[in-house]
Amino acid sequence: MKITIHRGASQVGGCVTEIESDGYKVFIDFGEQLPGAEKKEPLKIDGLNYGDVSKSALLISHYHGDHIGKICETNANLRIYMGKTALEIYKCLEQRLSFIPKKEESEKHKEIVERIEKINTFKALQQIKVGKIAVTPLFVDHSAFDAYMFVIEANGKRILHTGDFRGHGFRSKGLLPSLKSYAKNIDYIISEGTNIQRPNATIQTEQELQKDFERSFGKNKYNFVLVSSTNVDRIFSLYHASKKAKRCFICDSYQAKILKIVSENHKQYSSFYNIDYANKTTPAGRFFVLNPNRENFYSFDGELKPYLEKYGFCMLIRSNSRFQPLLDEYAQSDATRVYYSIWSG
């Protein structure tokens, strides 16, 4: 067995790892470098983006661009695997991005949409065989939903590739039991190290953040939250915080589609992912989907505006000019708060 870290050992993002055994190859992640990072020479990797790929497979740990962003550079015949819900979310995101005005960027995302049509999906503990290499995905908690670690077995050796994971999320309590059950007798660990050089970083748990939002929503009537559309657990926690603070919950149709993907796939496992779309009797967590008006901006029209101003709301926003008129309008009120809920690094 041979392990090669092609990229990711000396930087955050742009990850790609290779495990080779008897001519068969498993690659884990093939990502873009993070914006602002020093650009390195493009990678040319036999069995991944050139040469014979009949004995290769690429496994994607999660849908963040620094782990999946280079898939269009792979050989078209390469087998690619990804979590089922993660793939649905990623497809929704890329379809959305394929409509951005800049033609070059739009074409890039259209190419990704076409490429991911051929991706195979897996579920936790569903073993994948590549020659004599066996890979077992383990579900982990991360800001990207449906993320995985991998246990790789070949030539009598066992490797744990952690992917990105966290210990402060809603589903983190399953990490240690999962490792104790399925990651025994590990010979080598390939681990992410995002916070290794941030020893003084303060990390709140997602549960603590939800409580903070709940308290603030209760004190303030008009709440706008700038949040990544694919930070799924954070968004569901905002929904529950709104419900407990007796505020309405508002998002656009694209965000609603992502929430529906997760809810349909996972609400049977946890009520955390269950949204009461049918609620029309109480403002607590009442779900509204906003569509842009004729001028392509978001606004509260008709009977919606007095209802929201009576009971208050939490609205999800993104760095998009469509949301600006609403922000400008409600900026005049002392009851308005805007929250920046995005990783800054």
Annotate each PLM feature:
Residues K2-L59, D66-D233, S237-H240, C248, ...:
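His/Asp/Glu-rich metal-coordinating catalytic cores
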Residues G36, E88-K91, A256-I261, G345:
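Short, charged/polar "capping" segments at the starts of alpha-helices
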Residues S56, I116-N120, I133, Y273-I275, ...:
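Short, conserved active-site loop motifs that form the nucleotide-linked donor/cofactor pocket
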Residues K84, S253, I342:
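Short secondary-structure boundary segments
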Residues Q95, E111-E114, E264, K305-K310, ...:
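Polar/charged alpha-helical tracts
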Residues R198-P325:
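Hard-cation-handling environments
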Residues C314-F323, D328-G345:
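Conserved mixed alpha/beta catalytic, RNA-binding, or beta-rich assembly cores of soluble enzyme
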